[in-house]
Swiss-Prot record:
The presence of a 'disulfide through disulfide knot' structurally defines this protein as a knottin. This is Agouti-signaling protein. Keywords: Disulfide bond, Glycoprotein, Knottin, Secreted, Signal. SMART domains: Agouti. Residues 60-93 are annotated as: Disordered. It holds the Pfam family Agouti.
Length: 132
């Protein structure tokens, strides 16, 4: 009994490995550049070349004042984006995550848009860009 179970278990494991590896594409061994060029779907000559530039010591060192100026300018730029005026809200509108089937009015949130699924049977207002 134990021998037959061992044989059946071995056969089952073999069949599992055979089923798994039969679906994988065979690996190709490339021996030289010629076979690489002929087998590749993308032509390597069409890709843009990458240039490596060495940095000198002056470009690596940034003074503390310059770094603070850059940080403050980035903060000011982000504050200017936040302070942008919003469009006035229309009175009949659909709230975010509310149903907005096509005869319904527009979404209340200025950055929201009506997205439909399942052949326009389920529609809801969604905010796509949080930073809007």
């Amino acid at each position: 009994m134990d021998v037959t179970r061992l044989v059946l278990a071995t056969l089952l494991v073999f069949l599992c490995f055979f089923a798994a590896y039969s679906h994988l594409p065979p690996e190709e061994k490339l021996r030289d550049d010629r076979s690489l060029r002929s087998n590749s779907s993308v032509n390597l000559l069409d890709l843009p070349s990458v240039s490596i530039v060495a940095l000198n010591k002056k470009s690596k060192k940034i003074s503390r004042k310059e770094a603070e100026k850059r940080r403050s300018s980035k903060k000011e730029a982000s504050k200017q984006k936040v302070a942008r005026p919003r469009t006035p809200l229309s009175v009949p509108c659909v709230s975010t995550r509310g149903s907005c089937k096509p005869p319904a009015p527009a979404c209340c949130h200025p950055c929201a848009s009506c997205q439909c699924r399942f052949f326009r049977s389920a529609c809801s207002c969604r905010v796509l860009n949080v930073n809007c």
